[in-house]
């Protein structure tokens, strides 16, 4: 399970031509592997997210990129953070994650969520549905994907999906861990308790105890052993050798994006940031709140392998 994950959130880098983007992504993944991270994640989106960039920024298709990264790494597990369930037929997704497991020699993880970015759906002609319908679709999908990953041939005539004796050969090389992303206490964490090996929360440090209490309650109702589920948190981070370097990198990133300095102030209000000691203290507070690990991204300077290595060393020591 994830103790220390590294997410690659953006693909536009200062001074890097389009022909060099993939090599820069590979360098991040290799630096993460070399510095203590146990998983490398990429987003499953077609447009860049608000707060990181613009819709027309560079964005690679998730599973193609993960399969390519598998050829350049040896130890880290590989996953989407997280797969938008609405983007793919669930039986096809089962085949896709199985292929990733084989090309990575058994290092695939299925990270999945209900999907949320309406602009992508509208632009690509993918039905967005209602909030409740997206969760209905996720649950139906899990009842197709998970049996296929276990060697079964599920049939389902559901409200949203229909499969008949769906075959998945070859089978994964080993049991593929399932991680469900999100923090919704009624729907998401209930699905974690019912289907997942891991939960990845998107919430504040102060909210962690309440989220864990909700997960505990769902496990108790469903008869699930809570100790089987590991809980991590997504952390948007900025780190530098010093506090001042960290802030300077954020300002340089904002300038590269053409953002006003007011955006930097907004980012500082959202990020876990600072020099190594400051970042370590903030992450220790998260661990002390009850989670098992963190997954971080370095939006402003992750394209610099030295910063990935600094984050790995710092967080490895902080988590203990």
Task: Name each model-derived stretch.
Residues 1-72, 174-176, 251:
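N-terminal beta1-alpha1-beta2 module of alpha/beta enzyme domains
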Residues 2, 52-53, 80, 86-195, ...:
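Internal, glycine-rich beta/alpha segment that forms the wall or movable "lid"
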Residues 4-8, 40-42, 77-80, 108-112, ...:
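Hydrophobic faces of well-ordered beta-strands that scaffold small-molecule active sites
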Residues 8, 33, 132-167, 172, ...:
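An alpha-helical appendage that flanks or caps ligand/catalytic pockets
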Residues 8-23, 81-91, 173-184, 237, ...:
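Active-site mouth loops of central-metabolism enzymes
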Residues 9-11, 45, 83-85, 113-117, ...:
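Active-site beta-loop-alpha junctions enriched in small/polar residues
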Residues 19-32, 93-96, 181-194, 249-252, ...:
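Short, acidic/polar
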Residues 33-34, 66-75, 97, 101-107, ...:
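Acidic (Asp/Glu)-rich catalytic clusters
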